[in-house]
Amino acid sequence: MDASQQTADEVAERLFTSHQGTVEVMSVYLGDRLGWYASLASEGPATAPELAARTGTQPRYAREWLEQQAVIGLLSVQEDGAADARVYAIPPSTAEVMTDVSSLAYLAPIGRMFGAVGPALPRLLEVYRVGGGVSWDELGPDARESQADANRPWFESRLAPALSGISTLHDTLSRPAARLLDVGSGGGWSSIALARAYPGAAVVGIDIDEDSVTMATANARAAGVADRVTFLHQDASTLPAGRFDAAFAFECVHDMPRPVDVLAAVRTALAPGAPLVVMDEAVAEEFAPNGDDLERMMYGFSLFVCLPDGLSSTPSVGTGTVMRPSTLRAYGEAAGFTAFEVLPIEDFGFWRFYQLS
């Protein structure tokens, strides 16, 4: 419906529904970060005092959260008895969404992303007025870990079959001693997935966020691939020329203040004719009002996370989360890439894959 055709009651009803969703996402943040979902899933049903004792939290807060979770339909409860005697359980479906880090349905990290935004709201108001931005580092571990954990199950279960379906790319990645570059590697799960999919390859992940590099290094060590995966805290502009057989940029180009400079540096770091694969949001080809659910969500991330991060460095093109295919094509051409295509990878979450060469 066109915005001008809505009544005040319709707008108010929509906002009320959105408010419910907002507070429920924030309650997920509490349950995730305080270990309440994890305890119910791993240790079984509990009363409020029992859950509080298990997790080192306060019983009265635990009770309020448990009641709220039952009211919104995420937990089940045996209603007999006094408030502190009620026993709450987490259904398997809720447990999967909130605690199973390997499931494609794992969405608890989304709550963490907006938990990170809360403390930054005064700063966001300031930069909206006077300019500048709020960097990834300023958003802290909630944002950093949210991004890594939300993407992890997709990389672990879907990346290998997706890449193997692109025959020419798969052949390149399968070469003996192939050298792969992962730009903006974050928590490292994309690099780890590449190493597992192509055991003959050596993967170098780079990121300008030092804490992400530390986290990625620990993840690679725990995954048993540290002998073939290296993470470096550096800018792409310092990469050696002609070293890599393929490069990847997973959900990071839209965050870059100077994407053309980075893409040009990556092109130089690639062997002649080697491909760069970019995974970014599968937004619409062009802007239009009354967008779909994906477009609405991505503009939300852009307002509070990605655009402020991109504008935290100067100069900046200020791309934002909603990077249209034509925008990436223009960046690639300006960086010296002469070929651009959308890869036929379907059903991969919120993302679209591009190949530049």
Task: Name the predicted role of every residue range.
Residues R14-R33, A38-S39, Q68-A178:
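Conserved Class I S-adenosyl-L-methionine-dependent methyltransferase catalytic core
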Residues G336-S357:
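Core SAM-dependent methyltransferase catalytic element
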Residues V260-P272:
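A short glycine-rich, Lys/Arg-flanked "PGG" loop and its adjoining helix->strand segment in the class I
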Residues T57-Q68:
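Short amphipathic alpha-helical interaction segments
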